[in-house]
Design a protein with these regions (language model features):
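Short, glycine-/Ser/Thr-/acidic-enriched flexible segments
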Residues: 202, 240-242
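Catalytic alpha-helical scaffold of carbohydrate-active enzymes acting on polysaccharides/glycoconjugates
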Residues: 1-147, 152-195, 213-235, 242-305
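Positively charged, amphipathic and often flexible ligand-engagement surfaces
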Residues: 196-210
């Protein structure tokens, strides 16, 4: 059937130290590899409490138990507790993923700072944040990252330009409707060199609580989308969710996709499969576009058309 790329966003210290090893064990049992995108600097998850004033945020929180998934301690980082340095405290868990043969890349330096601010920050701030994450990644892994995936699907033009300057060939920084269509951005500086593979499938936290669905209801919905569907997809999961309380549901989802005949791959494997078609020079080019998607608060990078 199709290829479904497994992209793991790792946002917090707890997610890195607990969720990541859990996911690694599950993937090993299924004989699968995934792309793990790490937050490499301070964990300021508590700063996200100010999102309570954003439309839709309280509705999301009421559907998915933030305290249950993230833990009280994590929610106090940056508020009543100092934000721990994820890259320094969880480098061992990160290296284990690399050593196991999974693909590794950059998610962000400071997740909450990036997600809440980057859209309106200047190039100097943007590139300083990105350089910190690059330097830390190389320090931890001993090699440069091959891919990137924006925190909260938030970017700006300077960030996309930085990806090209780094030589990143493929990235996943936005959202799209189901059924993957790779594309490039038209920036003020010209057409981006890297290819975008947006997340095409809804995430667990966007499905749980809708029409009273629990996590297994979310699995059913995802499998309905991919049943007899020959189109490639990108699925984003989170170490804090699927790597912890939602792990049994994620295991059911993996089994379901394999039973449907899909090939579960890394972002790199997905990119190479599209490279092999010799069509990437002909893919669509679009301006950086913002929009909303169902059951997630706020605007994010969105593929149009």
């Amino acid at each position: 059937m199709a290829k479904i790329a497994l992209k793991v966003d790792v946002d917090t210290l707890r997610g890195t130290k607990e969720g990541v090893p859990n996911l690694a064990r599950t993937l090993e049992r299924f004989g699968l590899k995934a792309t793990f995108l790490f937050s490499l600097g301070p964990d300021h998850t508590g700063w996200a409490l100010k999102r309570v004033f954003k439309p839709g945020f309280l509705k999301k929180v009421s559907r998915t138990s933030v305290v249950e998934h993230y833990g009280i301690k994590t929610l106090l980082y940056g508020v009543l507790l100092p934000g721990p340095d994820i890259g320094k405290q969880a480098a061992t868990q990160m290296r284990a993923i690399d050593a196991a043969g999974h693909e590794t890349g950059i998610h962000t330096w400071d997740h909450v700072a990036w997600q809440d601010a980057v859209r309106n920050r200047d190039p100097q701030w943007t590139k300083a944040q990105m350089q910190k994450s690059w330097d830390r990644f190389v320090e931890i892994f001993g090699h440069p990252p091959v891919t990137y995936g924006a925190a909260g699907w938030q970017m700006n033009e300077a960030a996309f330009e930085q990806l090209d300057q780094w030589g990143i060939k493929y990235s996943s920084d936005g959202r799209a409707q189901p059924n993957l269509i790779p594309y490039r951005f038209e920036l003020h500086s010209g057409k981006a060199k890297h290819v975008q593979y947006p997340t095409t499938l809804p995430t667990f936290d966007e499905l749980i609580g809708i029409d009273d669905a629990d996590e297994f209801g979310a699995v059913k919905k995802l499998l309905e989308i991919t049943q007899s569907n020959p189109n490639d997809q990108v699925f984003t999961l989170h170490a804090e969710l699927e790597g912890q309380k939602l792990l049994p549901a994620f295991e059911q989802l993996l089994a379901g996709w394999l039973n449907q005949g899909h090939d579960l791959v890394t972002m790199g494997e997905l990119h190479r499969s599209w490279e092999a078609t010799k069509q990437l020079d002909k893919i669509a080019v679009q301006p950086v576009t913002w929009g909303e998607i169902p059951n997630r608060s706020g605007e994010l990078i969105l593929q149009v058309g």
